Amino acid sequence: MNGQKKKILLVEDDMALSAVYRSRLEIEGFDVREANNGEDALSATVEYRPDLILLDAMMPKISGFDVLDILRNTPETANVRIIMLTALSQPKDKERAESLGVDDYLVKSQVVIGDVVARVKHHLGIQ
């Protein structure tokens, strides 16, 4: 990557899974910050100003769907790229995320970490 590292906010309440994703993203050259619930995700987005957010859907305090809705309706965060990475595999869940403005929707059981990294790079315009 050229110049400054791209910033990723990883929002995941499963600490073990979060550690795996963080490690791989850092190996790939990203600056990664973690949030463990929706409330922390909102404050971290304002403070950290990430280039992309990997967002779980099912979390304590505020769901990923609500975080997505709030971010898309806040002028300062409306254009941040957001990939929802979730266990929810029903079409209605993906449709809900798309209606709220998600950039990509990945089901955890259907992807490996390399797929996630590839989608992150794609959305950040990295080869």
Model-identified regions with their sequence ranges:
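Short amphipathic alpha-helix used as the core "switch/output" element in two-component signaling
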Residues: 43, 65-78
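Helix N-cap/capping motif at the beta->alpha junctions
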Residues: 34-43, 64
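Non-catalytic signal-transmission and effector/linker regions of two-component phosphorelay proteins
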Residues: 1-7, 114-127
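Two-component/phosphorelay signaling modules centered on CheY-like receiver
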Residues: 15-33
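Conserved acidic carboxylate
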Residues: 12
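Receiver (REC) domain active-site loop signature in two-component systems and cognate sites
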Residues: 59
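Active-site residues of response regulator receiver
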Residues: 56, 86
